Amino acid sequence: MKIQAVFIDGFKNLANVRITFDNITTLVALNDFGKSNVLSGIDFGLSFIKASIEDKKDMMSNSQLIPGNCNLIGRNYKYEMEVAADIDGREYLVQYGYEFEWKDTEGKEPEIISEFLKVKLNEKGQKYAQLINRTAHTAFYKSSETGRCSSIIKVGETELVVNKLRAYDELYYALIITKLNGIKINMGNNLEAKSFCQSDSVIRKGFDNASINEDNLPQVIYRLKSQYPDKFALLKEAYIQLFPEFEEIIVKDFQLNVEEDHQLRENAPFQFTIAVYALFVKRKGLVNPVNFSTISDGARRVFMILTKIIVASVSNISLIAIEEPDNSVYSGLFGAYIRIIRELSAGCKVIITSHSPYFVSCLDPSGIYVGINRKAGVAEFFPFKKSGQKQLVNDAVSLDLRMGEYLFSMLADSESNIRDYLEWDNE
């Protein structure tokens, strides 16, 4: 499944945040605005779908996530998304969402009060068919292709219909239900890359093609090189383009003698690895390779981010987040860095956060969402109008400024006319 758009409301300081994803979508705002909250809100929304009923209840009671701004008190959490799903060679557009009441006062129990699922074939003239329709007191689903969305289904106050329908194998849209429950994103924080350079001796079981992740970078790179040599070559080529002082990326495995009776119990989710992996780089002018952990934090972080993008392409990940990539390389490389991210991420959406005028200047305004406070402390994000995109660039040039410099000068000026460039509603 490929994520096309999301909507988040009532999460931390976020209000009515609607993002339609481009290949690369960038959230731009001043420091400490709420950019990371958008990433957390997306992650929360999908994690909630996958969580158990008990975990859902805990998530709905998390005081760190409940809106605390005086303008948002009592606001429900809403999560909606639009995804594209390929089924039997045909593309379907899927709209799914839910709403719940937070446990924001003592004695109040959290409750899911709304849920919907709509699907249509992505062809001209097709209309959405409603497959799930839920309110606070009733829940319906469509039980047959020719029927209506009128079959009653009983669900608990902290249970989603889309979860319960996983057991209904006979449904004609069962594959869509399965895909919705299994959609994968990677919103992990990349700001600290050093820990990824360590190799763990205890790993999660089932470390196969589908579960490649960045929990252990040397092991990920070893598996990538072994199972997807073309992807490893692509990663290495992209990295050396940005850091030409490096000649080679080297990963080694050191076999361990782990006897069967020294393994963890059979039903444990972890096991001792049979090898320890180490990552090295060969730098021009040096006789011997150096351990990856000894190079600069920025260079490590860029490698981590590029690996994350490559892994997404072999792990069927729909969306990945990159926080402040401008902290990793000097400004002269911003353009090349963005180009490489775009090339490597084909088939996977990327959402970026940035507060760097110079980095933003290298972006296409059509993929930028600007963070604005219309009410004190409430974070909203707005895209540029089509006419505003060209006007922004032209106005920046007329002032002898880069586009990003002009944009941030308006963000810092409460009297600026920035709303003239944005798709601004009149709320």
Tell me what each language-model feature is.
Residues R90-N122, S143, N257-F280, A376-K385:
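Short, well-ordered strand-loop elements centered on a beta-strand within folded domains, enriched
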Residues F7, F116-L117, K184, E247-I250, ...:
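Residues embedded in well-ordered beta-strands within globular domains across many folds
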Residues G10, M81-G89, V119-L121, V281-G285:
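Short acidic, glycine-rich loop/turn motifs
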Residues M1-E54, Q271-E427:
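Switch/communication elements of ASCE P-loop NTPase nucleotide-binding domains
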Residues T20, E91-E99, E123-T138, K142, ...:
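Short amphipathic beta-strand/extended segments with alternating polar/hydrophobic composition
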Residues S40-E109:
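Conserved P-loop NTP-binding catalytic core
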Residues D215-F292, R402, M410-A412, S416-N417, ...:
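Extended helical coiled-coil dimerization/tether regions that scaffold
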Residues Q95-E247:
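Electropositive, glycine-dotted interaction segments
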